Amino acid sequence: MRYHGGIRRTHMVTIMKFEHLIEINDPLNPLIDALSIKQLWSGLVLRAESPKLFVPHLDDCVIDERTENSFRRRLRYGELVIEDRVLLEPMRQVRYEVAAQQDISASSLTMTIETPTEDTLFVRFQYQDGHDAATDAANAMYDDFRRSAYVESDIDTIGMLRELASQGRLDAMLN
């Protein structure tokens, strides 16, 4: 994995921007089963549509306002309910957008499929979390912890996709 990250300041709003790549197919490593772009895409969409498979502490997810390339979700973690919108760019990108709500600042996660060569496949995870300058100092010390949690969650996601692919469940979704 390669990591790129940083914090960028614009117009008195601090945006924690963090991104990293996870290599899906490595032609030099025969121990890893290769996934097709279609399998990977199906898995990333499954993560958005069935998040309880990927987030064990999620209590409930309700999906509504579905269009051809987007849907709204209401995620419940105990008493906390978070609303987000998922935008799909087929076979390329899944983007989660959380509008500011209650004590939660606006944020986004973009997962982009990258194919630098015919034999390689990556997912780029990009996080943006905007908060105002007043809360910046309080949040700064937590950013490293959040980055680490994001990476672990993303590694777990890809691990789950590999497991589902090995069981043929991602191929079944394609039919």
Would you name each region that the model predicts?
Residues 58-62, 82-87, 107-115:
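Hydrophobic/aromatic beta-strand elements that line small-molecule binding cavities or substrate pockets
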Residues 18-20, 71-73, 84, 96, ...:
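Hydrophobic residues positioned within well-ordered beta-strands of beta-sheet architectures
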Residues 11-62:
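Hydrophobic ligand-binding cavity/cleft-lining segments
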Residues 138-175:
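A conserved amphipathic terminal alpha-helix motif
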Residues 101-152:
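Beta-strand/loop substructures that line and gate deep hydrophobic ligand-binding cavities in soluble
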Residues 24-26, 77-79, 127-131:
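Beta-strand elements of well-folded, non-transmembrane domains
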